[in-house]
UniProtKB/Swiss-Prot annotation:
The keyword Lipid metabolism applies. This is Ceramide Synthase FUM18. Residues 373-406 are annotated as: Disordered. The gene is FUM18. It is found in: Endoplasmic reticulum membrane. Residues 124-364 form the TLC domain.
Length: 427
């Protein structure tokens, strides 16, 4: 990139001598260096987002098309609410591109310099701090937003309201923005986990991310956004505390890290094993009582139904293609949603078992270790030891596997990941 600016500057004097940078000694510092730092971000996903925004601003004729990427679509003028439509795909795509750029920019130009200023010296730890810092920044915005939506909703104190008056074809703009942005975030996470160097918990992350994306899509397309937003709020509660604890660990605030870990432990139980299972129970017991197996057709202002559920598979596909077409609720759909939720609960129960061991260790005076999927061991935190092959010495210890594939890799990775370190004390 700097070569491009050098070429541009070398050609300026031949035609516009009064712009010669030699007459402006601060040209390099004021213009070239900032641009060479910023423009590398405008690559890949971020470049596409920038192009869409530029077209929207500069070409008025393109606004009907580009506005779908920049703003929520399918607003109903009579009510001010929003419906589901194909424009949502464009909005989510732009959100994915934007989040990818924000993640890269915040990590590289905000969080990494902050870590170095605070005394984090090893580059690997700087990267890990930046990754956790970005997660903390994101959820510091979207978890309170989700809590606000939940607190203002009728199902805050009555879980029956999660299912009453289904289907809600139109939803509030804030809820739509929240759901679609969360969907974009998890899609961006899938991209990130495949761009970065693979960790031992790669397959666990992939499975978790795809289950989350599937649940968000099912809740949105089949008009169950109330329960979808509630599940996101419950799952996201610890996504602030966990990266916060890890950031404190990297910065050396060991006592505060232990306190945050205790808060994390309590929040995990309440959000992921009490409220979450209450929601699963509501899916199991309340849904059959409140929602009869039936179908509806048309927009919110022209809704027809209830209609009988067809025997074919087309009624499951139709909402994805025709948002105002037939949408059905059946017992098989309820069981599918419940199965996804319980699969996540199984993963969380496994994690919680190891979290309990960590908590016992903390009470015994040992270093706190967390067991989330972002793996960090002492071996990974240590500096590489040259051995002539490019591998770290720790990777070549007897009994350690340097590679595997398929299900064996996933199982082996899970066992190691759930024993990973989040030491609040640096050794």
């Amino acid at each position: 990139m700097s070569i491009v600016f050098s070429v541009v500057r070398s050609r300026i004097p031949s035609h516009y001598g009064h712009y010669n940078h030699s007459h402006h000694p601060h040209f390099e510092d004021l213009v070239v260096k900032p641009l060479t730092n910023i423009l590398p971000l405008l690559t890949g996903f971020t470049l596409l987002a920038g192009v869409i925004l530029l077209i929207h601003i500069s070409i008025p004729q393109a606004e009907p098309y580009t506005s779908k990427f920049l703003f929520l679509s399918h607003r109903q003028p009579s009510t001010g609410l929003y419906s589901v439509g194909d424009g949502d795909v464009c909005f989510v795509l732009f959100e994915v591109l934007t989040l990818a750029g924000l993640r890269e920019g915040c990590m590289k130009y905000l969080l990494a310099p902050f870590a170095r200023v605070m005394g984090v010296s090893k580059e690997r730890k700087v990267v890990r701090f930046s990754e956790q810092g970005w997660i903390l920044m994101y959820y510091s915005v979207f978890w309170p937003l989700g809590m606000l939506i939940w607190a203002k909703s009728p199902h805050f104190s009555d879980m029956d309201q999660l299912w009453i008056h289904w289907p809600q074809r139109d939803i509030d703009g804030l809820i739509k923005f929240y759901i679609l942005t969360q969907l974009a975030y998890w899609i961006q996470q899938v991209i990130s986990v495949n761009i970065e160097a693979r960790r031992k918990d790669y397959w666990l992350n992939v499975v978790h991310h795809f289950i989350t994306i599937t649940l968000i899509l099912l809740c949105y397309v089949y008009h169950h956004t109330r329960v979808g937003s509630l599940i996101l709020v419950m799952m996201d509660a610890i996504e602030i505390l966990f990266p916060f604890a890890k950031c404190l660990r990297y910065l050396g605030f060991t006592t505060l890290c232990d306190l945050v870990f205790f808060l994390f432990f309590v929040t995990w139980i309440v959000s992921r094993h009490v409220l979450y299972l209450m929601t699963c129970w509501s899916v199991y017991s309340d849904v059959p009582r409140i929602i009869e197996p039936s179908c509806f057709m048309g927009s919110a202002n022209d809704l027809h139904g209830p209609l009988p559920v067809p025997d074919d598979w087309w009624h499951l596909i139709e909402p994805w293609i025709y948002p105002k077409g037939k949408v059905c609720h059946s017992d098989s759909f309820r069981v599918s949603i419940l199965a996804y939720l319980l699969l996540l609960q199984v993963l969380m129960m496994i994690w919680f078992g190891f979290i309990c061991k960590v908590a016992i260790g903390v009470l015994d005076g040992r270093a706190a270790e967390d067991v989330r999927s972002d793996v960090e061991s002492d071996e990974e935190d240590s500096e590489p030891v040259a051995n002539g092959s490019g591998w770290q010495q720790s990777q070549l210890q007897p009994g350690r596997r340097v590679g595997s594939n398929g299900a064996a890799q996933m199982v082996d990775g899970v066992k190691k990941d759930l024993r990973c370190n989040i030491h609040c004390n640096e050794e």
